[in-house]
Design a protein with these regions (language model features):
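Conserved N-terminal beta-strand and adjoining loop/helix that marks the start
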Residues: 1-18, 37-39, 69
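Acidic surface patches and DE-rich sequence motifs
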Residues: 13, 24, 75
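Conserved Nudix-box catalytic region and its N-terminal flanking loop in Nudix hydrolases
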Residues: 16-54
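Nudix hydrolase/Nudix homology domain
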Residues: 28-31, 102-161
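Unchanged
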Residues: 38-62, 71-125, 159-161
Length: 161
């Protein structure tokens, strides 16, 4: 079973929550917070800072959290993913999109009241925890677990455990 660790960042400004548009292999685009796979030997925060800068041009100078951790297993597709989500307490730089992986095609601060609508096109395991955090702004770390059934992204069924 393929396993990987992903870091995800919650960056807020007066304009809202930072979301990036990801062009998937099938050509579809969905929105998520910035982040990505943590390289072997990297700490989550080092890898997450790298991903945020690569995808958005912003440099995080202080982290809080983790806000939540997520565990998702897709037995049919043969993968297991762990996600650690941190809040950027402070950051600098100008927002720009220049993703070396070519996945991120847009980035913007989305007003908080619009986040649920923008995130509706992405997986439940992405938008559900973010929607809950935006609504509640909890302090203590939370944990989420999901099972993903099926082996084709477009028809996978996601269940919160």
């Amino acid at each position: 079973m393929r396993q990987w660790l992903v870091g995800s960042a919650l960056l807020e400004s007066d304009d809202g929550l930072l979301l990036v548009a990801n062009r998937r292999r099938d050509g579809n685009v969905d929105w998520t917070p910035p982040g990505g796979v943590i390289d072997d030997g990297e700490s989550v925060l080092v890898g997450l800072a790298r991903e945020v800068e690569e995808e958005t041009g912003l440099v995080v100078t202080e982290w809080g959290g983790p806000v939540y951790r997520l565990d998702a297993e897709a037995v049919d597709a043969g993968w297991h993913m762990q996600v650690e989500v941190h809040r950027a307490v402070a950051f600098t730089g100008e927002l720009r999109v220049d993703d070396p992986d070519g996945i991120v095609v847009d980035a913007r601060f989305v007003p908080v009241e619009e986040c649920s609508a923008v995130l509706a096109s992405t997986w439940q395991l992405v938008h559900e925890p973010i929607a809950e955090w935006v609504a509640e702004r909890w302090v203590d770390e939370r944990r989420y677990r999901y099972r993903v059934d099926g082996d084709v992204r477009a028809s996978m069924v996601i269940t919160r455990l």
